């Protein structure tokens, strides 16, 4: 297919999605929840087909020499699929984000202004591997009244085709037009999707650093996402050693390919001699490769030396860099210089240190005495997430339903005109909030 043919075909798909989304936006909460329940049931019924498609994807990816972190994201086992379907049902239980009155204000007698939440329109989701992301995103899109065009990586095509097939079958029995969900599978379609600013309202990329940056640099459509997942745990001088070990190990090994896994461990110099040998042993038992700065090597001479590159590297693997710092101030400076504004944690029993850390670390998530792996829409109670944003502007952090809506102003009058409120005898506004 030529570039022109791809563009023409994708324009048609985008128009169909937008039309279907406009009808979805008008449906009742009950109708949307029924559709979400039907999607969950259809996915359960297609479980074997989806899992087999993923096995086929994994085998093909292995033959092509896929990178280890990407392979881990690609794998969809029965446990992951079950959790994803449970997440769909959880979205059905969430409050409807559409039609919420944010402002209701009388400007004058009979002249009332409202600000009401409404869908964004059509979402363009581009992701590498991680087929369960498609399930999460589809459920959130339906609940928030948005159409969604999914573009999966070539390594996950079979899995995503099986998922979207099941979703469309489920929607076909409901009031939601199945055309509200679309799937693209080729690189050429990715480039054309990024040009569809007439039909697509938001692009959400999920993948590697280079991939997200490519998307950000090649579209005029607003992009929500993050390009890096360089997270830290700082072990303060007042840390409880056992808590520090447990959190450090969990934040690194529970799922090292996740963007909320830590890449650097910062340790206060006054606690380093006691803490580092213990945490090193715990991490070694989980086969984590350690790298350390000069002072760390004096305590752990058997590990590799860290370089400046390590502080800005997202390993997404069983590798962890360690640096000893002289103070909380130095730890915060390191995080703000090398971190990705994703999620960073402090382990301490010092309340004042927590307040300083929370106030000065410029990340979407700042945690105290708990693992960075909690930075997740499902764990936050959002039902699921479409992605994580490290941007300064909202939405920020794990993005659930609230990040997929915008608002419009509705005003109702009785023949009111602006001339009444201007000039020498201008009538004053009442500006009374209901």
UniProtKB/Swiss-Prot annotation:
The keyword NADP applies. Pathway: Amino-acid biosynthesis; L-proline biosynthesis; L-glutamate 5-semialdehyde from L-glutamate: step 2/2. It is found in: Cytoplasm. Its EC number is 1.2.1.41. Keywords: Amino-acid biosynthesis, Cytoplasm, NADP, Oxidoreductase, Proline biosynthesis. GO terms for biological process: L-proline biosynthetic process. PROSITE patterns: PROA (PS01223). One of its GO terms (cellular component) is cytoplasm. Its main location: cytoplasm. Pfam families: Aldedh. It catalyses: L-glutamate 5-semialdehyde + phosphate + NADP(+) = L-glutamyl 5-phosphate + NADPH + H(+). GO terms for molecular function: glutamate-5-semialdehyde dehydrogenase activity; NADP binding. HAMAP family: ProA. Belongs to the gamma-glutamyl phosphate reductase family. Catalyzes the NADPH-dependent reduction of L-glutamate 5-phosphate into L-glutamate 5-semialdehyde and phosphate. The product spontaneously undergoes cyclization to form 1-pyrroline-5-carboxylate. NCBIfam families: PRK00197.1, proA. This is Gamma-glutamyl phosphate reductase. It comes from Nostoc sp. (strain PCC 7120 / SAG 25.82 / UTEX 2576). The lineage of its organism: Bacteria, Bacillati, Cyanobacteriota, Cyanophyceae, Nostocales.
């Amino acid at each position: 297919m030529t570039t022109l043919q791809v563009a023409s075909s994708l324009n048609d798909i985008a128009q169909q999605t937008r039309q279907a989304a406009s009808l979805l936006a008008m449906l009742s909460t009950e109708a949307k929840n029924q559709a979400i329940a039907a999607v969950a049931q259809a996915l359960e019924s297609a479980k074997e087909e989806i899992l087999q498609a993923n096995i086929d994807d994994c085998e093909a990816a292995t033959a092509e020499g896929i990178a280890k972190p990407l392979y881990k994201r690609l794998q969809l086992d029965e446990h992951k699929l079950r959790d994803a379907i449970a997440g769909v049902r959880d979205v059905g239980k969430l409050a409807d984000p559409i039609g919420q009155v944010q402002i209701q204000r009388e400007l004058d007698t009979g002249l009332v202004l409202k600000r009401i939440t409404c869908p964004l329109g059509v979402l363009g989701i581009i992701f590498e591997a991680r087929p369960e992301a498609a399930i999460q995103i589809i459920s959130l899109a339906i609940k928030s009244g948005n159409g969604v065009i999914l573009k999966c990586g070539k390594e996950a095509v079979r899995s995503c085709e099986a998922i979207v097939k099941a979703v469309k079958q489920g929607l076909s029995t409901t009031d939601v037009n199945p055309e509200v969900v679309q799937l693209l599978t080729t690189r050429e379609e990715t480039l054309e999707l990024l040009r569809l600013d007439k039909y697509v309202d938001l692009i959400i990329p999920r993948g590697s650093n280079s991939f997200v940056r490519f998307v950000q640099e090649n579209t005029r459509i607003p992009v929500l996402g993050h390009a890096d997942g360089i997270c830290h745990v700082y072990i303060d001088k007042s840390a409880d050693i056992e808590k520090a070990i447990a959190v450090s190990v969990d934040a690194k090994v529970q799922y090292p390919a996740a963007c909320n896994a830590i890449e650097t461990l910062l340790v206060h110099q006054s606690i380093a001699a006691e803490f580092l040998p213990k945490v090193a042993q715990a991490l070694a038992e989980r086969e984590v490769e350690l790298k350390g700065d000069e002072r760390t090597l004096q305590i752990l001479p058997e590990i590799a030396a860290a370089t400046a590159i390590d502080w800005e590297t997202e390993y997404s693997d069983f590798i962890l860099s360690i640096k000893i710092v002289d103070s909380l101030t130095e730890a915060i400076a390191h995080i703000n210089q090398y971190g990705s504004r994703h999620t960073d944690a402090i382990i301490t029993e010092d309340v004042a240190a927590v307040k300083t850390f929370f106030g000065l670390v410029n990340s979407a998530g700042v945690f105290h005495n708990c693992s960075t792996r909690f930075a997740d829409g499902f764990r936050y109670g959002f039902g699921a997430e479409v992605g994580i944003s490290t941007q300064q502007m909202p939405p920020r952090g794990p993005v659930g339903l609230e990040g997929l809506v915008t608002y419009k102003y509705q005003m109702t009058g009785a023949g009111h005109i602006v001339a009444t409120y201007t000039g020498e005898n201008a009538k004053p506004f009442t500006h009374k909030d209901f």
